[in-house]
Amino acid sequence: MLRHDGRSNTQLRSVRILRNYIKHAEGSVLIEVGDTKVICTASVEERIPPFKKDSGEGWVTAEYSMLPRATAVRNQRDISKLKLNGRSSEIQRLIGRSLRTIVDLKLLGERTITIDCDVIQADGGTRTASITGSYVALVDACRTLVKKGLISKMPVTGTVAATSVGIVNGEELLDLCYIEDSNAEVDMNVIKTDKGEFIEIQATGEKSSFSKKQLDQLLNLAESGIHELIKAQNEVLWKD
């Protein structure tokens, strides 16, 4: 099928990761996946949540938000509603647990790294772009800790990236933009490590059910996209 932006069914949108985007953060990136743009920062704080007290371990957590005009129609800020909306809450928990999967919390020591993901322009795949960009910010924050002598070795034990796949007009597509996502019969987000292991699969039959064969095809498609994303992460992390 001819996609909205001219891509093939198996093609990612263009990916750009710009490191050190925010001056004061220990790690930061601007990630662009097509027209979706997210600023991801990693901030180190010498404290841990109460449930980690005396554990000898650190913590990695995340917050997610979207600028009011990141979308075609202005959205209210969560603060104006005096509560975090359910979608933002779900996404930030997803980001946090995805990153904790590849961090040795004992090596991190009793400190917290907070990941802030701020969507400045949304065109589908904001949660997957947030995870992919946050990984790079997290690595840079941990490198800062090593350089300062606050930890002896890198606590990051692997790589994590995420992408979306779906079925639109009966065809399996990689990396859905907003128009495709809003018209998908099946929508799926996939998070994997560089070892090929799954962290999370979120699959929903939005307008129809799907078969085991289709599930396998979507997972294979996601795997190919994540392989490309991990390559892009490594290229920016090791170019200097």
Swiss-Prot record:
- This protein's UniProt keywords: Nucleotidyltransferase, RNA-binding, rRNA processing, Transferase, tRNA processing, tRNA-binding
Q: How does it assemble?
A: Homohexameric ring arranged as a trimer of dimers.
SUPFAM superfamilies according to UniProt: Ribonuclease PH domain 2-like (SSF55666), Ribosomal protein S5 domain 2-like (SSF54211)
In the record, biological process GO terms are: rRNA catabolic process; rRNA processing; tRNA processing
Q: Which PROSITE patterns match?
A: RIBONUCLEASE_PH (PS01277)
Spell out the Pfam families in the cross-references: RNase_PH, RNase_PH_C
Report which gene this protein is encoded by. rph
The record's listing under Gene3D superfamilies reads: GHMP Kinase, N-terminal domain
The catalysed reaction is: tRNA(n+1) + phosphate = tRNA(n) + a ribonucleoside 5'-diphosphate
State the InterPro entries in the record: ExoRNase_PH_dom1 (IPR001247), ExoRNase_PH_dom2 (IPR015847), ExoRNase_PH_dom2_sf (IPR036345), PNPase/RNase_PH_dom_sf (IPR027408), Ribosomal_Su5_D2-typ_SF (IPR020568), RNase_PH (IPR050080), RNase_PH_bac-type (IPR002381), RNase_PH_CS (IPR018336)
Q: What is this protein called?
A: Ribonuclease PH
State the organism of origin.
Ruminiclostridium cellulolyticum (strain ATCC 35319 / DSM 5812 / JCM 6584 / H10)
